[in-house]
Amino acid sequence: MYLREDDVHLADVRCGSTTRGWSPLRPAPVFGLVLVRDGVLRGRSDGVEHVLDAASVFVERLGSEQQFAHPLGPDTFTEIVLSEPRVADLLGGDPTVPEGLVMVTPELALAHRLLLSRARRDADGFELAERTALFAAAVFARLAPDRVASGRPASAAARRRLADDARAVLAARPTVGLEALSRVVGASPHHLSRVFTAVTGSTLCAHRDRLRLARVLDRLNEGERDLAGLARELGYTDQSHMTRAVRRAVGMPPGRLRTLLTSGGA
């Protein structure tokens, strides 16, 4: 399990079943997206059969009667589980999921692998929550584009205000999570992420990382030596996480930066 929040889960699942026949009929316990990466699944949902492979995303509706079979044996898939409020956020306020298959475009395939790549490395909960919400929105946009588009703020001024409010909160509270940020500004995480990117040209995560980098540089310029404490203060997972982020941004670790800055760049 890479991400477990109230409204969204992200997991890498390996199903070791060797049963080729159908599983017992049961109601789907969650709203979810199933993205097969290796193998083939056959699914029945309310009597309709689907083939799930690496070129498709299966959109699972809570309560639908389901069965699955594994014709090639064990398979591996990514699962994104969404709460009913989060599904409603993604679908213009209506939590009714248009169940079925979405064919994977090259853009979706790449976004899926980038999401997993970040999850397996040093992405924190804020980044994963934003990436997962944006990915789920991209899937739903192919299944129900009008409903996904219906939640957009009505005017450019409203979009700008929302982005500005988010920037103000992030500047004051660098450790705030995506869910908390969304509550403060009065928008769903998905709509906030989408509007912020449209207005600023940057994701919320990238903007937050720039703010954190600026604070790191200022503190190093002041000679800060407690790097572990600085990492905790700014919301990094640990000192190693901060070191990787700083090195990725400016090409050198915090210790070398401190030496450079306190020596006047000589």
Model-predicted segments: where are they?
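Amphipathic alpha-helical segments enriched in hydrophobic/aromatic residues interleaved with Lys/Arg
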Residues: 93-152, 166
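Actinobacteria-biased recognition of intrinsically disordered, low-complexity terminal regions
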Residues: 1-5, 255-266
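N-terminal positioning helix adjacent to the helix-turn-helix/winged-helix DNA-binding module
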Residues: 155-166, 200, 209-212
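Basic, amphipathic alpha-helical hairpins
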Residues: 115-123, 138-147, 165-177, 196-200, ...
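Intrinsically disordered, low-complexity basic tails/linkers immediately adjacent to helix-turn-helix/homeobox/MYB/SANT
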Residues: 217-229, 233, 237, 263-266
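N-terminal regulatory/effector-sensing and dimerization cores
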Residues: 1-97
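Hydrophobic alpha-helical membrane segments, chiefly transmembrane helices and signal peptide h-regions
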Residues: 11, 34-35, 58-60, 78-87, ...
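Basic/polar phosphate-binding segments, predominantly the helix-turn-helix DNA-binding elements
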Residues: 178-214, 231-260
